[in-house]
Swiss-Prot record:
E.C. numbers: 3.2.2.-
GO BP: any one term: base-excision repair
Assigned keywords, A-Z: DNA damage, DNA repair, Hydrolase
Record's keyword annotation contains Transferase: no
GO MF: alkylbase DNA N-glycosylase activity; DNA binding
Keyword Hydrolase attributed: yes
Protein name (database record): Putative 3-methyladenine DNA glycosylase
InterPro entries the UniProt entry points to: Formyl_transferase-like_C_sf, MPG, MPG_sf
Organism, scientific name: Legionella pneumophila subsp. pneumophila (strain Philadelphia 1 / ATCC 33152 / DSM 7513)
Family label: Belongs to the DNA glycosylase MPG family.
Length: 183
């Protein structure tokens, strides 16, 4: 595996989202190394995207989104589930890619179909918020043998409040992969 470097994340959010598919999310939590293949993502395009957290402006919660690309943005939803995002583009944009589902590769026994489930299975929590994804214990890597697949584009899940942004085709997943989240 080859760890992705900062320039990968500093590009257009939609391009980064599509190119994250098939990559490996790696987390060594001090006990064991967990690896999952990214099979589903959603792109959030910055302050003008009404479904994006940064659309409300710079806050303590969203500060990481406005920082350098290649950092993790991890937040709690419904008071019980963590969601993991990858910050993209240049500083000040406020864009990110939500990791929605993983295919288990190593040391993952729990379900990974959905952002909360994958975070639980990978032991991702608020301690990893603002973590540099170029670290040695939490990163995304290119697999040694990439595989070909077809990318499906659909509207994002659970963003009906985002007006015209609710129907944008910004959810991407690997066609026919059994680990994509259920809608």
């Amino acid at each position: 595996m080859r760890k992705l470097l900062r320039p990968f994340y500093e590009r257009d959010t939609v391009l980064v989202a599509k190119e994250l598919l098939g990559k490996y999310l790696v987390h060594h939590d001090g006990l064991e190394e967990k690896i999952g293949r990214i099979v589903e993502v959603e792109a959030y395009l910055g302050q003008h995207d009404l479904a994006c957290h940064s659309s409300k402006g710079l806050t303590k919660r969203t500060k990481v989104m406005f920082g350098p690309a290649g950092y993790a943005y991890v937040y709690l939803i419904y008071g019980m589930y963590y969601c993991m995002n990858v910050v993209t583009e240049k500083e000040g944009i406020g864009s990110a890619v939500l990791i929605r589902a993983l295919e288990p590769i190593k040391n993952i026994q729990d379900r990974t179909q959905g952002p909360g489930l994958l975070s639980k299975a990978m032991r991702i929590d608020s301690k990893l918020n603002h973590r540099d994804l170029l670290s040695n214990d939490f990163y995304i890597a290119e697999p040694n043998s990439p595989t070909d697949f077809t990318i499906i584009e659909k509207p994002r899940i659970g963003v009906h409040y985002a007006k015209e942004w609710a129907n944008e085709l910004l959810r991407f997943y690997i066609k026919d992969n059994p680990y994509i989240s259920k809608t």
